[in-house]
C-alpha cells in the first residue's frame, strides 16, 4: 500500500501534533530533534518539517548532525537510502551543518524530541538534558527508546510524553488499511492514506 514506508514516522508526528494541540502548541515554528536516520526517523523529520517545524538535529550510530536552518530531507534521503552513507557525509555536503562524532543528540536544544532509533537510547541523564534545554514534548517513534528512568524525569519535569505503543502505531494502522484494501480489491491514494 502507498505510505507503507512513511507510515510509522508520519504517524508519530501526527500523534505528537494532537498531543501538542491539546496544550495549544503546534509544530509550526517548533525546533525538533529526531534520533536515528532510518525510515521512521527520516519520515518523522519530513512530516514535522511539512507541518512547519525545523528539524535541527538527527543522528546515526556514529554521531549526530546539528543544523540550525533545518535538515535538507531530500539530500538526507539520498545519502541514507540511495548511497547508504553516513550522516558525516551529509555534514560534508551541507553548509552550516556540524557533525558531532559519538555525540549525544539529546544535548541539543529543542521543543520536541522524537526518539526513532533504538530501544533504551534515551536514559535518565539524557532526559534531564532535554528538560534543562526546554524540551516540552517527547514521542517515541522507535519501540521503547526511553528507559523507565527517562520517563520518570519527564513526569517530574512536566514534559508531555507519548509512549511508542500509541505514538508509533501509524505503521500498524496502515497495515490494517492495506489488509482492508486487499480484501476488497480496492486501493487508496497516497493523500487519502496519509
Predicted regions and their residues:
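Rossmann-fold NAD(P) dinucleotide-binding segment
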Residues: 100-110, 120-137
Amino acid at each position: 500500500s502507498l505510505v507503507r514506508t512513511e507510515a510509522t514516522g508520519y504517524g508519530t508526528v501526527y500523534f505528537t501534533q494532537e498531543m501538542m494541540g491539546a496544550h495549544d502548541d503546534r509544530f509550526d515554528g517548533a525546533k525538533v530533534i529526531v534520533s536515528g536516520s532510518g525510515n521512521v526517523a527520516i519520515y518523522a523529520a519530513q512530516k514535522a518539517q511539512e507541518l512547519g517545524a525545523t528539524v535541527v538535529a538527527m543522528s546515526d550510530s556514529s554521531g549526530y548532525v546539528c543544523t540550525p536552518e533545518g535538515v535538507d530531507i531530500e539530500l538526507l534521503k539520498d545519502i541514507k537510502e540511495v548511497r547508504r552513507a553516513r550522516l558525516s557525509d551529509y555534514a560534508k555536503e551541507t553548509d552550516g551543518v556540524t557533525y558531532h562524532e559519538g555525540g549525544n543528540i539529546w544535548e541539543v536544544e529543542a521543543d520536541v524530541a522524537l526518539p526513532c532509533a533504538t530501544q533504551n537510547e534515551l536514559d535518565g541523564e539524557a532526559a534531564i538534558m532535554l528538560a534543562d534545554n526546554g524540551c516540552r514534548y517527547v514521542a517515541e517513534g522507535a519501540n521503547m527508546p526511553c528507559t523507565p528512568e527517562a520517563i520518570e524525569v519527564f513526569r517530574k519535569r512536566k514534559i508531555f510524553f507519548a509512549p511508542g505503543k500509541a505514538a508509533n502505531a501509524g505503521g500498524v494502522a496502515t497495515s490494517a488499511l492495506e489488509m482492508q484494501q486487499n480484501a476488497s480489491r480496492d486501493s487508496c491514494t497516497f493523500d487519502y492514506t496519509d
